[in-house]
Amino acid sequence: MSHQVKGLKEEARGGVKGRVKSGSPHTGDRLGRRSSSKRALKAEGTPGRRGAQRSQKERAGGSPSPGSPRRKQTGRRRHREELGEQERGEAERTCEGRRKRDERASFQERTAAPKREKEIPRREEKSKRQKKPRSSSLASSASGGESLSEEELAQILEQVEEKKKLIATMRSKPWPMAKKLTELREAQEFVEKYEGALGKGKGKQLYAYKMLMAKKWVKFKRDFDNFKTQCIPWEMKIKDIESHFGSSVASYFIFLRWMYGVNLVLFGLIFGLVIIPEVLMGMPYGSIPRKTVPRAEEEKAMDFSVLWDFEGYIKYSALFYGYYNNQRTIGWLRYRLPMAYFMVGVSVFGYSLIIVIRSMASNTQGSTGEGESDNFTFSFKMFTSWDYLIGNSETADNKYASITTSFKESIVDEQESNKEENIHLTRFLRVLANFLIICCLCGSGYLIYFVVKRSQQFSKMQNVSWYERNEVEIVMSLLGMFCPPLFETIAALENYHPRTGLKWQLGRIFALFLGNLYTFLLALMDDVHLKLANEETIKNITHWTLFNYYNSSGWNESVPRPPLHPADVPRGSCWETAVGIEFMRLTVSDMLVTYITILLGDFLRACFVRFMNYCWCWDLEAGFPSYAEFDISGNVLGLIFNQGMIWMGSFYAPGLVGINVLRLLTSMYFQCWAVMSSNVPHERVFKASRSNNFYMGLLLLVLFLSLLPVAYTIMSLPPSFDCGPFSGKNRMYDVLQETIENDFPTFLGKIFAFLANPGLIIPAILLMFLAIYYLNSVSKSLSRANAQLRKKIQVLREVEKSHKSVKGKATARDSEDTPKSSSKNATQLQLTKEETTPPSASQSQAMDKKAQGPGTSNSASRTTLPASGHLPISRPPGIGPDSGHAPSQTHPWRSASGKSAQRPPH
């Protein structure tokens, strides 16, 4: 390239010199300017000589005198001619200079283009060798005088934006992975290479800083999202269970995790606003009777049997209602503990109601937004289920098991949709199953009521055994343990789909637990009314005892009055603490029964089947007893009703929520271990939604039913006179009215009184019901419209598929017909060409010999003319278009039978 450029330069210089020597008018150098000046001097000297010759002629012919007018006129004319010649010479010189400059500029551009093309790869190789940043190389090139034009910058900017869009949309491209990686690397290299050229100086540095911070921010958000995913408790355990047991079993553990989070918030609310202020700022233990163990109970207050029944020191601790004092303010902060206790009790139900409804709403929105379709279910699972980013063998095994389980779920759904059944037999069996279950529910309710009534008689006796003290809790736990399997056995008669059967099973167990719980509450309320009647007597006895004590003691001004120890003061029964103790016992006994059932019914059963199967008479794994399946309905309903007891009992026992948090925490680890080690998947696995909206609906109903007894005790029953933060008041809600009157301005009290008017509350409730009805109708209409649109989309998809299939068949048919027609047309064209061209003498002789050969008939030797009418048909002279026979011809590459033969080489 350099030799060519040098040759072009030498040729250009030689041409310039030649033009200067020849005195051509197109020279463009200093020599040209000098030559033009020489020509101007010659031109100036030429008219002088002409003038001399003319003067000689004039003198010879009689020229005018020097001062004559004719002499003056000729002088003026000569002067004008000289000025015109000078102006023409200057104009010629300027035009020649412009032409020379233009030629020099075009020559420089022609010689600079190959130089620039050669310098670009040199510069890139140099930058690669030095391994310097791209921005420094661009800055050095800009400082060297090679700045980019505006058009080039615009082109670079456009290409950079295109590459960025390609990087952003790389995931959605239907390309192979190798092509994606190649294109991604090339796009990233291009962006890094040319992005810095869009700025200069400080602007360039600011742009680079912004890009760096943007990349850092994207990386931080990605890492933070990964961190949040890792912070989700028990997520990997639940995914492991889902991969082996299906989404139905995993839905229980998701629900258990959600319940743990709700109880953790409730525990923080109660512990931070009620228990901690009373312990830190309230009166210490032993200072007043309600915080002191009675003298008669001090001897056995620390025995294990007493503490196990939540008596002794536990009864007079901050875990229960009776420990809290009724002082309006406590401590140096003047903390209003009674008001805080009341508001926290109300807030527990308010927060639970809001969080349950919000969770149901979010799950509903997520389920409607998914838009799942039943088209090509198995194809989608087969070709799109695997995650290609898995790099761990254990994770790959879990994913494999999860895909297998999802196939089983889809197969069950397909079988159930295509199943035919005897409708009359099915109806009879379902009616029989419901009758048996109703009998079981009535029997369990009567049994609980009978046991509670008998426990009231045991409470009046002195020497009571451990079973008689805990008979109610034991009976309720046994009913909760044995009734769900009985219901499941009866439900086998109904032959429902597994998902529908689970809902019926949950509803029946829900009715069982609800009946047991409300039977227990009714019997407990009878006990509460008896204790309230006894409190009036104890209250009068206490007052008379203190009056006689102080009157019978002799004292004067010099002798102080003997103090009465808090342990010796007579006290009432404190029915709120008694109710809290009953709920505490129920919670602990239910937890123990659940753990014992898992150990005996699942773990020991699995060990027996596993190790005794080799030496037993029959196959223990396939027959009786076999491995246990995870009881979804029983565990879910047990969790829901345990939470209902927590909601009811937390008002009377603030420490109950903390015990429930520990119970849920241990249950998660214990049940996860038991499921993975002792249980097997269900024989008929089925798909369950991870949203758990059915569970949430049951939980919302239990929350509403748990609110009713607490609201009844707050609004109707008088509190105990000697224990709890509401002692000394007629009703518990009086603390709210007292706080408004003493701590708020008068007009706020009037506003609260107006808002509490039943004439305003009842219309507000009716308006809320109307709004709920309206929104429900709107949601139903929208769901129907959504279903119709989905059907329309499905129909359009089927029509489009049918059109595509028809079009594909047509194109396939055309593609099959096209080669035949093309070959046929080519043959016909060749025939036409041969007919139009006159054959040579040798060819005509050969044709005549073949036509006259033996064994050849006239029809066989006849050439078939093309069938298409648009092709030209040549006929020999003497044969018209209407003649009856064609000439006897045969092409040299066509056999007598009409089949094409291989053409001989020339």
From Swiss-Prot:
Lineage, highest ranks first: Eukaryota, Metazoa, Chordata, Craniata, Vertebrata
Transmembrane segments: 264-284, 337-357, 432-452, 509-529, 694-714, 751-771
Biased composition (Polar residues): 820-846, 854-866, 886-900
Keywords: Cell membrane, Ion channel, Ion transport, Membrane, Transmembrane, Transmembrane helix, Transport
Function comment: Pore-forming subunit of the mechanotransducer (MET) non-selective cation channel complex located at the tips of stereocilia of cochlear hair cells and that mediates sensory transduction in the auditory system. The MET complex is composed of two dimeric pore-forming ion-conducting transmembrane TMC (TMC1 or TMC2) subunits, and aided by several auxiliary proteins including LHFPL5, TMIE, CIB2/3 and TOMT, and the tip-link PCDH15.
Gene transcribed to yield this protein: TMC2
Protein name according to UniProt: Transmembrane channel-like protein 2
Amino acid composition bias (Basic and acidic residues), ranges on this chain: 80-127
Source organism (scientific name): Homo sapiens
All ranges on the Extracellular side of the membrane: 285-336, 453-508, 715-750
Membrane topology: Multi-pass membrane protein
InterPro entries assigned to the protein according to its UniProt record, in alphabetical order: TMC, TMC_dom
A single Gene Ontology CC term: stereocilium tip
Biased composition (Low complexity): 135-147
Biased composition (Basic residues): 69-79
Annotated region (Disordered), positions in chain: 1-150, 800-906
